[in-house]
Amino acid sequence: MTYRMIVSLALVIISMNYLEAQDFREKPENVYLNVSFVVVQPQAEFSRNVTNNGYGVDFDGGWYVYNGPVGLGLNLIAAQYGNFSRKIPYSYFSSLVSLTETTQSTIFIVNPYIKPTLRFGDFSFHAKFFAGYQLLETNTTIKNDEQENNQQEEDEPDYIAKSKVSSDSAFDYGVGLGMRFPIFRNLEKGPIFLSLEMKWSKGGEAEYLNASKEGAIVLSDPAEGPVTTTLNPDRSKTDLFNISLGIGF
């Protein structure tokens, strides 16, 4: 998991703490929100091309219809499953100044769902039935040392150049099981919950690049002239198993 993903997750937790500090007495009791760390594990033929797990952030929110046992909601996931970096000289004539070229493969998932729930006071156990959309992207960025180490000023760009080198999508559907229980109680603002969830999904066929896979990105020999890059994407169905652990309201 990259430094940027760790920072993103930290910002999410800080944001949740800020929201918790606000007055939530006006929030409807039948509305819920979870922000979680997610591990995305490829399954079946997808796992033969992507042997490593993906790591990212899982946003989940919805409402219980008429405060009953059935919830309707939306789940958003962003997880990185591939990464490849190399140092390149800034100038063809000197290697004293170098840049970092990074290629990252990311999956984005959007899933509306129905959520039957069994509640015992603040404790709840639920199932999920969902269907939605997966987007698999690979992007390459070039950064200097300050940008790579996040030392640039706020008004300065995060990178020198960026290109999308691979993109495809697929529909998915699946089921999930999970639970929520309070870990902190505030009489005025309500409890803070710990959320644990597992999801199994069947994905359609898509073409994708795994930047971490050997042979997916092939570079020519610099001694033979300007470097050329050959991409070798894979194509398969995109089945997944996800585990999410986070906090919610």
Q: Where are the regions that the model predicts?
A:
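Predominantly the C-terminal beta-signal and adjacent terminal strand-loop region
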Residues: 178-249
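Residues on the lipid-exposed face of transmembrane beta-strands in outer-membrane beta-barrel proteins
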Residues: 35-39, 57-63, 78, 110-118, ...
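Short glycine/proline- and aromatic-enriched beta-strand/turn motifs that initiate or cap beta-hairpins
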Residues: 21-71, 242, 246-249
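Gram-negative (and chloroplast) outer-membrane scaffold detector with strong preference
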Residues: 62-152, 156, 168-173, 186
